[in-house]
Curated annotation (Swiss-Prot):
This is Alkaline proteinase inhibitor. GO terms for cellular component: periplasmic space. The gene is inh. Residues 1-17 form the signal peptide. SUPFAM superfamilies: beta-Barrel protease inhibitors. Keywords: Disulfide bond, Metalloenzyme inhibitor, Metalloprotease inhibitor, Periplasm, Protease inhibitor, Signal. GO terms for molecular function: metalloendopeptidase inhibitor activity. The keyword Disulfide bond applies. It comes from Yersinia ruckeri. Inhibitor of the alkaline protease. Coiled coil: none annotated. InterPro entries: Inh, Inh/Omp19, Protease_inh_b-brl_dom. It is found in: Periplasm.
Length: 124
């Protein structure tokens, strides 16, 4: 009976870290807009601030709470950068919504083909 040998190559932290870089808070802070990608969808304004709720972990976010609650289920109070996107959080750091990097900003794909919420920086 032949013996099957499986070799697993593990990447070092250095190699993985070089492929996904954590964006700086200062590079992402500012005015943003959220919108469901359907015709006539309301635009929700949100500001990603560079003032920490929890140092080096969660930063303040504020915006149109009614609009954000309707769109996301609850209005985010915080945010944090991730190597592959932006996480909007409540005040304790629990996830409200995750937006992955996309060609024209950041996107959150809703379940059951309900659409895609797009997060875009407001051009100043």
């Amino acid at each position: 009976m032949p013996i099957l040998v499986v070799l697993t190559l593990m990447s070092s932290g250095e190699i993985m870290a070089s492929s996904l870089v954590l964006p700086k808070v200062g590079d992402l802070s500012g005015q943003w807009q959220l919108q469901l990608n359907v015709s006539g969808a309301k635009i929700c304004d949100i500001e990603l601030k560079n003032t920490p709720i929890t140092p080096d972990l969660i930063w303040h976010a504020s915006g149109d709470t009614d609009c954000l609650s309707q769109l996301l289920g609850s209005a985010p109070q915080g945010w944090r950068p991730t190597p592959d996107g932006i996480m909007l959080t409540d005040e304790t750091g629990s996830a409200v919504a995750f937006f992955e990097r996309a060609q024209n900003g950041y996107e959150n794909t809703l379940p059951d083909d309900a659409g895609v919420i797009v997060l875009r920086r407001v051009q100043e």
